[in-house]
Amino acid sequence: MSDSMLSGDAISILYGLVGLFTIFRLVQQRSSFFDRIVTEEDMHLVWLIAFFLLTPLGVLAHEAGHYFAAEYYGATNVELNHRGYWGFVTYYGTFDSSTQFIITGAGPLIGTALGLVCFAGAIVLPIRMILRHLLASFGFLE
């Protein structure tokens, strides 16, 4: 395992601990967080949730974009490695530059699409204001 993988894993562990702290805060503040009044403290918690709890889902979606594109174009031994706050896809195959471009771009394309869906959801879904802020914040991060 390379040094960069170890440092990425260490950061994921640290972020995971902050994520656990965020869950603890959310449980403690659930009644005020989910009421109809959005405070500055609620917004701080929204950003913590968006980054430390939802970002791993965005990373997974990003890597899945690479994975499915590689599978679609006939790569062999395609493997998705999700490490929480980072990940990578490995595969074997020889591709022309345009196919490689598509496989490489599939991850960011999925992330962008997910972000736009979150923004749209924040606008059109009939949900509480705090959940609108959460969707919009995650969409911004994507």
Kindly give the residue locations of the regions a language model identified.
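Hydrophobic transmembrane alpha-helices and their immediate loop junctions
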Residues: 1-142
